[in-house]
Amino acid sequence: MRVAWYWFRTSFHRRWTNYLTIVLLVGLVGGIAIGSVGAARRTQSSFNVFLASTNPSDMNVLLYAPNLTSKLSRPPLVRHVEVTTFADLGFPAGRHGAPRLPAAMTSGDVTGLGSVNGELFSQDKLAVTAGRMANPNKVNQFVMTAAAEREMGWHVGQAVPMYFYTTAQENLSTFGTAKVKPSLRLTMHLVGTVVLNDEVVLDEVDRVPTFMIFTPALTRPFVGTGVHFDNYALQLDHGARDVPAVEREIIAALPRGATYNFHVTSTVSGQVNRSIKPESIALGIFGLIAALTALVIAGGLIARALQRDDGDLEILRALGVNRMMTASSSLLGVLGAIVTGAVLADVVGVALSPLSPIGPIRAVYPDGGVSFDWPVLGLGFVIVVVALAAAAVALAQRRARRTAVHQRMLDLSSVLGRHACSETSAFR
């Protein structure tokens, strides 16, 4: 080993450019490969990560009935229930004490969504894409989806005078005029743009209605004023496994003729994951292509670097160094370059991680920034080192054998030459 180390130190100044080329190629192209595979995994898991960050419900049931929160909490498998109510409680203030009825609201494209006991604030939490979340204890703060803001022509930071009415008032024939006095007058502050956790990926048909969302502090006083469409978000003891049993219990407990609509979170999750799968597959394939490219080109550079050592290896063989020592002498620098390049590849892969995930989840992804995907980093490092080191060892041994054969041929030629000279002298 001392011979190999001595040979490496004395020849490094002539070969450092070869080693640097191997390091940069393996590090940069291999890093792109590792980064791409990591991005593929991060993209594919992005919706599950986002959904988990919202404290999701396991199922929802939409009912047109008086508030049934306590009744729906009774089934043994139900751990917690929170409620939102679909009701146009508030309208922009118009002239002379009458509400203004925008076309977006009268058509149903934009509707009010009020949190009753914390739904959308502590469970199925909204993802904020601009501004901030409304304070659930403030009556004069609200948030909207981006589509609702466009429909209404409002923006984050805007103060909107609004009138609020009970269900009974809205059912009066004179509603919409100054004859019906609002139950509450407020200057509402639009503090944020949000995305619901089940609306990150939407089909065209699901884009309406879209929502302006009011706090529990504002919604609670209006909940008991009439019958609304209420959405009950249920968290179950054993997650999606309990959904069929709870559905049966709810259906059995409802009044005859009641209409209901179930919404299962795991179904939505599966649909979204399937929709982003093509992007993650494309990233994974690109990463594999980059990895193969790095290995093939690096293998060629290693072969060229070892070929340049042939002259020195012949000298070492002539000095009596055995074949194994000859091979290790030429491998020391190359193996060091391979390991350094593999480390650099992991560094590049980590540096590229803030570019992922890609796709619709990126805007709401909670864990953006640098990511250390240790399975990808570790496996990538091992593959690069093992594959290139194996190729380097095989090439070095092959060249060492070739050098040994060449040296024996030279020795044989020398012996034959001396023998021929001796015979010539004797003949004379």
Explain the meaning of each model-derived region:
Residues 1-295, 299, 304-308, 323-324, ...:
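Membrane transport/envelope proteins' first extracytoplasmic loop
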Residues 313:
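Conserved phosphate/oxyanion-binding catalytic-loop motifs
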Residues 334-342:
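Transmembrane alpha-helices
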Residues 342-353, 357-358, 377-415:
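C-terminal membrane-exit region of the final transmembrane helix in multipass inner-membrane proteins
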Residues 376, 411-428:
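Cytosolic juxtamembrane regulatory segments of multi-pass membrane proteins
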